[in-house]
Amino acid sequence: TYTASQGLLLMIPNMYKIAGEFLPCVFHVSARTLASHALCIFGDHQDVMSARQTGFAMLAEGSVQEVMDLAGVAHLATIKSRVPFMNFFDGFRTSHEIQKIEMLENDDLAPLIDQEALAEFRARALNPMKPVARGMAENPDHFFQHRESCNNYYEAVPAIVEEYMNEISKITGRKYGLFDYYGAEDAERVIIAMGSVTEAAREAIDYLVANGEKVGMVAVHLYRPFSAKHFLAAVPKTAKTIAVLDRTKEPGANGEPLYLDVKDCFYGAENAPVIVGGRYGLGSKDTTPAQILSVFENLAMPMPKNH
């Protein structure tokens, strides 16, 4: 399914049911803004962030080549994990980019399909010869317990996605992780972001590292379920200040979603870095390498500005 913006929001009630009943599927979303004070058809993450609580796993890409490589990961992982996936990339900036890429063919992906999981999925199909009842009503005595019973499935997703990323890497030669680090090994100032802004950030980081600066970036691929273990392993131990860049706005919130997730990962940690949040690129407003330089300059201040 290929959708975006208000079209995705219309699916939210069904997304709860799809995830709740463990129905494997993939929604490919060219992430776009939502109509608020005015109509805007351009790109940001307001639509996908509005659906992050539905139970769909969320996989993000920052370039056309990443979309080609990781879309297959979403399809392979949803069959094996039984968790539906929302595979998203930036509307217009990535979805409309004309770029030369290396293609993955069906023959590359077919051997990676978990045939046992696929057979089990087909066996669960509704069949009048084997009638079953699913998704029925529940009362207070059972609903809570059954709602919590999904946890094991979601805890298994990061390892499954990582497994298929490794398989895709063997085919393509391009290394992918749940969180990809780019920059100096001993970085003290680090940006956390996802989507096409990571491409601009790489340009700024190349310039700064070449000039002796200790900077870097963690690009988020698997946003939901958010694996704190994998995230913390990707962040350099030398990091002193972190800027988390969100491409969405939640009026009235203490912080945007990715910022709050990152803050939670460091909660209670000894010598935790200073973490600040920032917002960028609403409605496809350009974010340039020069603006990324400004983010790193802010992180170098004794008291970096937050939000």
Language model segments and positions:
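Thiamine diphosphate
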Residues: 1-52, 56-79
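Conformationally flexible catalytic loops at phosphate/diphosphate-handling active centers
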Residues: 85-180
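Redox- and metal-dependent alpha/beta enzyme cores, enriched for Fe-S-associated oxidoreductases
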Residues: 185-213, 226-233
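Structural signature of the thiamine diphosphate
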Residues: 58-120, 284-307
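Peripheral docking tails and interdomain loops at the edges
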Residues: 241-307
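Short acidic, glycine/serine/threonine-rich loops at helix termini
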Residues: 11-15, 36-42, 69-72, 96-103, ...
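A glycine-rich helix N-cap at a beta->alpha junction
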Residues: 23-31, 109-118, 241-243
